[in-house]
């Protein structure tokens, strides 16, 4: 197989285009061009062609990972899952994720802290936040430090009850507010304490 043309990147693209005889196009990184000594007119044997195809697949997956992460942050587990859903093999996905971690595009510890801050700011409690960490495939090894940064739940519960519980002596109203707080991830003991505080506030 012969390389007919070797075209440099056209900004903002960063990949080189390798035009093979027969019209097949492969896009590879500059390091691949240099490492494999590519040039127009080069004849590729099967081993060299396989290596070039593998490099092109790797470059495409890295570009896809960058695009995904530019839309929103995600954990290494999420990125791996999404790459495989797009057709990457288990090995290809793992290698791409490892590359993203190595260059700092993915950082599970920082992502965990960002999730905790985000959901606590929205008024959610510990159990809801843990569920989100699990759902987003954040490794449990990164949970402890992130959860340690949570503020006390009292303020969030008190703010919610101030809006939703007008009469803390009304059992029906209390149950409705309690159920809503439970869905937000607060424990029943935290909720009960919050209702008691609300009673004193309305006396």
Model-derived regions, located:
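An alpha-helical, amphipathic repeat domain used for nucleic-acid recognition
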Residues: 1-203
């Amino acid at each position: 197989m012969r390389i007919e043309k070797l075209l440099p990147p056209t900004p903002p693209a960063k990949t080189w285009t390798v035009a093979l005889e027969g019209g097949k196009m492969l896009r590879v990184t500059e390091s691949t061009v240099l490492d494999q000594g590519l040039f127009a007119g080069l004849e590729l044997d099967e081993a060299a062609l396989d290596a070039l195809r593998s490099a092109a697949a790797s470059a495409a997956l890295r570009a896809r990972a960058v695009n995904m992460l530019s839309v929103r942050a995600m954990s290494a587990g999420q990125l791996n899952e999404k790459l495989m859903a797009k057709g990457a093999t288990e090995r290809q996905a793992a290698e791409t994720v490892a590359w993203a971690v190595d260059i700092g595009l993915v950082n599970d510890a920082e992502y965990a802290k960002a999730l905790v801050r985000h959901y606590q700011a929205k008024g959610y409690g510990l159990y809801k936040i843990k569920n989100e960490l699990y759902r987003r495939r954040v490794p449990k090894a990164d949970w402890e430090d992130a959860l340690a940064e949570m503020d006390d739940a009292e303020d969030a519960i008190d703010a919610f009850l101030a809006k939703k519980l007008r009469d803390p002596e009304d059992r029906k109203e209390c149950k409705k507010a309690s159920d809503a707080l439970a869905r937000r991830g607060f424990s029943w003991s935290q909720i009960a304490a919050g209702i008691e505080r609300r009673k004193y506030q309305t006396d």
